[in-house]
């Protein structure tokens, strides 16, 4: 049977989601945990490959298991007892055998948290920017993202992908809980895309470029023309949407 896990994790202590040689990953930790609890070798497939230090307040993964998990609350309790403090299983659902946590997603939402005041307790959870920036200009620039689909300029160099096209459905800055938060939703994202977009918008907010600079960057299709990649600790995956009737439990 195939199961869908809903979980969250603080990425500060991990080299991203995906298993890597000689590095600790979120995927590796969860697979070891589930294999012990279910007494069977378990492999999980995540909804995406978050980079080192990136967090997820909402993340999904699927795995196959030969038996029916009858008591799901007990499974969740045991899983969280085994897992470290910075990874939490939230829910478990039965799904169709052809469900895929990564390729089945219709959209994803990321948030990037930025604070303009120094707080040592936020060092691993947001980006502290010392300079004054104009968030109004940054919001105007962000609106331009809706006009394009090819975002090669924001993709990590030498990315091995079939297409650089993404359909952005939301992109805006808001002030929440003493943070400036950039929220962006799209049908798919390129590697390093969100952090590069945020870095480019910050340079516009700092006055280094005019708002229309974003048009030139996107049309150039060159990573060198875009802004810097902001630090990983401010980035969160916050939502994933799947087609209706994905869950067999419903």
Map each language-model feature to its residues.
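Structured-RNA-binding interfaces characteristic of tRNA pseudouridine synthases
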Residues: 1-250
């Amino acid at each position: 049977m195939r199961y869908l896990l809903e979980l969250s994790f603080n990425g500060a202590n991990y080299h991203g989601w995906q298993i890597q040689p000689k590095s600790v990953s979120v995927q590796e930790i969860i697979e070891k945990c589930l294999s012990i609890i279910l007494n069977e070798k378990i492999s999980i497939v995540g909804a995406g490959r978050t980079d080192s230090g990136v967090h997820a307040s909402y993340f999904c993964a699927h795995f196959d298991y030969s038996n029916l998990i009858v008591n799901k609350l007990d499974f969740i309790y045991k899983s969280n007892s085994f897992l470290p403090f910075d990874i939490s299983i939230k829910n478990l659902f039965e799904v169709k055998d052809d469900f895929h946590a990564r390729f089945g997603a219709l959209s994803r939402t990321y948030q990037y948290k930025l604070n303009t005041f120094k707080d040592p307790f936020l060092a691993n959870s947001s980006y502290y920017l010392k300079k004054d920036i104009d968030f109004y200009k940054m919001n105007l620039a962000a609106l331009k993202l809706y006009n394009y689909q090819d975002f090669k300029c924001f993709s990590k160099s030498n990315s091995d992908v079939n297409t650089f096209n993404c359909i952005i459905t939301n992109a805006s800055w808001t002030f929440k809980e003493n943070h400036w938060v950039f929220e962006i939703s799209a049908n798919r994202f390129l590697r390093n895309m969100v952090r590069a977009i945020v870095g480019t918008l910050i340079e516009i907010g700092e006055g280094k470029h005019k708002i229309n600079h974003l048009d030139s960057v996107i049309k150039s299709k060159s990573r060198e023309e875009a802004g810097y990649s902001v630090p990983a600790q401010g980035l969160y995956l916050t939502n994933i949407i799947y087609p209706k009737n994905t869950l067999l439990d419903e």
